């Protein structure tokens, strides 16, 4: 089996190639990855908004994976990468017309999100659905070595944080467990939701890290101190205000049994955080 990953140099894309186990791998990205090169993956340099290059790139692959993030395409907007970039991928698959599998990484509880991020993701999903043989993967927050969140949570935990809202549920899923679910769901045509069953708020994550670091925990902010506590957290410059507001949403899903079906003991984010906080010998 041959796969190509758009956004392959990012966390999700890199792990897809590392963990899927395809006979041939390629990644389409502006950035070359020495890690993927060492695995024998072919680098296709390009911008996801370059229609001609994208149309040419998808040819010859059994599975086409769309895992590009806005930060992977410097200077491009979230809308450009997710919507216009996806249109190019869909055009390429339709042009090849060989029943290629399109795998798109979206976000769980998308229908509840009111921000531009979620609106754009919904539009992108609409484009994905134009390909009959598609799989939309809607995970909660994904963690693992090299993820985009854990290091910054540790940085936050090292800061003095008096209070923060006890809201939301990250329901984090380890990338290895997510890939196990995906590999067992490739025959699915449609969308799958993947979240952990153990609830964990952003404040819980910070306090787990604080405890592992030997620091005093932050207290839950009340109604009157909620807004100021969020502002103070964003002023530390570790997470943007938009990111912090996203962390206060609920990414738990009652009807997602896929993780338990295919992974008997899902990896715990609390344990992962505690281990990440320990001094490395």
Set out the residue ranges of the language-model regions:
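N-terminal Rossmann NAD(P)H-binding glycine-rich loop of SDR-like oxidoreductase domains
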Residues: 3-22
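NAD(P)H-binding glycine-rich loop region in Rossmannoid oxidoreductase-like domains
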Residues: 35-88, 92, 108-112
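Conserved Rossmann-fold NAD(P)-dependent oxidoreductase catalytic core, especially the SDR/UDP-sugar
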Residues: 70, 84-122, 130, 135
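Short-chain dehydrogenase/reductase
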Residues: 79-83, 114-125, 147, 171-172, ...
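Flexible, glycine-rich beta-alpha linker
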Residues: 112-116, 137-154
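Conserved loop-to-helix N-cap of the C-terminal "lid" that shapes the substrate pocket in Rossmann-like
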Residues: 136, 166-179, 191, 199-202
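A conserved pocket-lining segment of Rossmann-fold NAD(P)-dependent short-chain dehydrogenase/reductase
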Residues: 153-173, 185, 193-195
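Mid/C-terminal beta-alpha module of Rossmann-like enzyme folds, strongest
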Residues: 184-240, 253-256, 260-281
